[in-house]
Design a protein with these regions (language model features):
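N-terminal edge beta-strand
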Residues: 4-32
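Acidic glycine-/aspartate-rich tracts in secreted/extracellular proteins
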Residues: 10-14, 41-46, 54-59, 97-100, ...
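Short strand-edge motifs at loop-to-beta-strand transitions and within beta-strands
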Residues: 26, 89-93, 156
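Residues within well-ordered beta-strands of beta-sheet-rich folds
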Residues: 29, 35-39, 92-94, 103-107, ...
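Negatively charged
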Residues: 30-33, 68, 77-80
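Solvent-exposed, conformationally flexible loop/turn segments
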Residues: 31-33, 88, 152-155
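Extracellular/periplasmic metallocenter environments
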Residues: 45-47, 72-121
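Charged, alpha-helix-forming regions
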Residues: 121-206
Length: 206
């Protein structure tokens, strides 16, 4: 479960952007059974009612969806008609089991949104780093599983959903054969942040 703040930015036309992430109209991943709040209270959203459907700019999806304006639950028609004049605007969805592929879009203008993939095991989109991730986290246990596509950019960061820096990170490449890298820098102490060992290998710590 998560809350995403939504705003509209100019990016080859108006586009939705989540949590001030650097990319617009991204594909979202939401976990079945999770509850997600899309907060469209930013002033840029006033003329762009944020809705979810089963097709891009198409049929509205209502299963598990609640619309709120100024803290009051309203119908879909009241939500879209009163969106611009409301101070706070939220769409809340609890993703049902076996939910279809969904889409988020503006009920007035086309071309602003993107796709929503739903899943039963992977987790949900995270925008805390410079690279978008899919995170399934257990903050009580201090453990999370993160999936992402790297961009070979030095200094890139990823969100992990734990709220604190993890002491150990284990990285497994999915598109090539390579030993699992285990980051141990935070155990070794200050100045050792980049150090790691490899599972199934005999090299020294690097």
């Amino acid at each position: 479960s998560a809350t995403y703040t939504v705003k509209v930015v100019s990016d080859s036309g108006n586009k939705y952007r989540f949590n001030n992430f650097g990319t617009s109209a991204v594909t979202l991943d939401l976990a079945e059974g999770g509850t997600y709040t899309f907060d469209g209270s930013d002033s840029s959203m006033s003329g762009h009612p944020f809705v979810i459907g089963t097709a891009a700019n198409g049929t509205v999806y209502s299963t598990g969806v609640t619309y709120q304006l100024d803290g009051v639950s309203v119908t879909y028609s009241a939500y879209t008609s009163g969106y611009a004049s409301a101070s706070t605007r939220k769409l809340i969805i609890t993703v049902p089991a076996s939910a279809p592929v969904l889409y988020y879009w503006c009920s007035i203008h086309s071309g602003m949104g993107g796709q929503i993939n739903t899943n039963s095991t992977l987790g949900s989109s995270n925008f805390d780093g410079s690279t978008q991730t899919i995170v399934k986290a257990n903050t009580t246990a201090g453990f999370s599983i993160v999936s992402y596509s790297g961009n070979d950019t030095s200094g890139s960061t990823i969100g992990h959903g734990l709220g604190v820096v993890p002491q150990i990170t284990i990285i497994k490449r999915r598109i090539a054969s390579e030993d699992w890298m285990v980051g141990i820098g935070h155990i070794l102490g200050s100045g050792k942040e980049g150090h790691y060992v490899k599972l199934n290998a005999t090299e020294a710590e690097g």
